């Protein structure tokens, strides 16, 4: 999940939030139907999620990672029906 050194500074997090398996995805169903209507055959089980990218400063990578975890669990994902994953990279300079 991570790249870069453990020094402090600026970090960029790319966060992907998706519905948990088994949770009905009405947007995904609509997209699958539209793709079929447009002639794209063989498309099934479309899932629609969201992507959040943010920049943060932290004294070290572990603190940055813990902060992003708290952001996801507090605001960015509804943990009852969604799951999340993120990549964290330290910005150069």
Where are these regions (language model features)?
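Long, contiguous binding/interaction regions
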Residues: 1-93
């Amino acid at each position: 999940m991570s790249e870069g050194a453990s020094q402090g500074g600026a970090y960029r997090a790319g966060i992907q939030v998706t519905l948990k398996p088994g949770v009905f995805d009405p947007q995904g169903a609509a997209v699958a139907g539209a793709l079929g209507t447009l002639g794209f055959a063989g498309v099934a089980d479309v899932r629609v999620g969201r992507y959040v990218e943010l920049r943060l400063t932290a004294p070290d990578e572990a603190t940055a990672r813990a902060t992003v975890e708290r952001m996801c669990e507090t605001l960015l994902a509804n943990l009852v029906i969604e799951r999340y994953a993120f990549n964290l990279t330290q910005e150069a300079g």
